[in-house]
């Protein structure tokens, strides 16, 4: 019904606003049974067919993507990198804490010492623009019980506490970022409240990554690898949904 109802918007504007009385008088052209009643069965079957066609097209796309990505996989060499060399720009969070900022459900992500919700504690006002930091980076959690040593990839801009340090590299995207955070998290077992993840210790951490023939991080391999995993998971889900249609 939604596409048909939305067509009513063509009749209205700021000079002729919709109201309760006008909406009551509106008429919708819908499929009807032989008895003149709304044919809900037809509408449901029609939309299921549309959904099924879209699903089949999507399945084909992801099958092809998985096939292409698999061709790019294969043997790979690995090399150790100092975190400070991998991320030439390492900056700490700028916020002084939630007591100094107003919470807002429609605001910006506020990051803190947690590995839950991709590091997001809540959403806050954007008023203090000096504390807003750019996304497309990796957030390294340096404090917090149960969270110290973890890292998360952040795509969006954010405000964060000083318990986190953010690494920037021009090759980062959500695929290379999640590849690196998965490996970077292996270090979490070495830290505790007696041996904290200071900024200095963080910069000296070692991350082992796949490399190309020049010995540089193989960003293309990392991206292809994560795309392959993503496609495989989506493909599994879509097949499950497709099986539901069979019933």
Task: Locate predicted features.
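Conserved hydrophobic/aromatic beta-strand scaffold that supports enzyme active sites
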Residues: 27, 110, 137-139, 166, ...
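A short beta-sheet element
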Residues: 1, 121-182
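Non-catalytic DNA-recognition/assembly elements of restriction-modification systems
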Residues: 33-97, 101-118, 213-247
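A structural detector for beta-sheet-dominated domains
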Residues: 31, 84, 141, 170, ...
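Well-ordered mid-protein domain cores that form the structural environment of catalytic cofactors
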Residues: 1-12, 16, 168-195
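Eukaryotic intrinsically disordered and solvent-exposed regulatory patches
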Residues: 13-14, 96-97, 125-126, 152, ...
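A short glycine-rich beta-alpha junction/loop motif
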Residues: 15-34, 158-164, 195-213
